[in-house]
């Protein structure tokens, strides 16, 4: 990525986070690289991560290829849903923090899978 692209991504990330701060104290943050995808449910009031899942886990590594794709991301969404469902009902409603990533591709596939599993955001 060029320096211009990095600056534009940083501005987009800050803009998204600023808007999310006013909405809710519980957010689902995602990070993706070329090889892996990470998602974590963060309680900003308590300052801690409530639940997390990624493509580094053995259930996903057995199925996924060397690069992150929609199939692997759907498995990560199911793992995260299992971990959240065991928690308090307040954690079923949160805001989706896509960071600097556009809502397309694996980010959109992850969000759609979570919505189909009954989460509201």
UniProtKB/Swiss-Prot annotation:
Gene3D superfamilies listed in its UniProt record: 3.30.420.100
Organism: Anaplasma phagocytophilum (strain HZ)
SUPFAM superfamilies to which the protein is assigned, alphabetical: Translational machinery components
GO BP terms, alphabetized: translation
CDD domains given in the database record: Ribosomal_L18_L5e
Name of protein: Large ribosomal subunit protein uL18
Subunit relationships: Part of the 50S ribosomal subunit; part of the 5S rRNA/L5/L18/L25 subcomplex. Contacts the 5S and 23S rRNAs.
GO molecular function: 5S rRNA binding; structural constituent of ribosome
Any one of the GO CC terms: cytosolic large ribosomal subunit
Family to which this protein belongs: Belongs to the universal ribosomal protein uL18 family.
UniProt entry tagged with the keyword rRNA-binding: yes
Purpose of the protein: This is one of the proteins that bind and probably mediate the attachment of the 5S RNA into the large ribosomal subunit, where it forms part of the central protuberance.
Pfam families for the chain: Ribosomal_L18p
InterPro entries: Ribosomal_uL18_bac-type, Ribosomal_uL18_bac/euk
The entry's keywords: Ribonucleoprotein, Ribosomal protein, RNA-binding, rRNA-binding
């Amino acid at each position: 990525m060029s320096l211009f692209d990095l600056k534009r991504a940083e501005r987009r990330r800050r803009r998204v986070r600023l808007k999310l701060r006013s909405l809710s104290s519980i957010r689902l943050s995602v990070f993706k690289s070329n090889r892996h995808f990470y998602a974590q449910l963060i309680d900003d009031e308590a300052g801690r991560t409530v639940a997390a899942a990624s493509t580094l886990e053995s259930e996903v590594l057995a199925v996924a290829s060397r690069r992150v794709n929609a199939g692997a991301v759907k498995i990560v969404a199911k793992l995260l849903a299992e971990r959240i469902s065991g928690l308090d009902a307040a954690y079923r409603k949160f805001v989706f923090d896509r960071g600097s990533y556009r809502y397309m591709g694996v980010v959109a596939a992850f969000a759609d899978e979570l919505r189909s599993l009954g989460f509201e955001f």
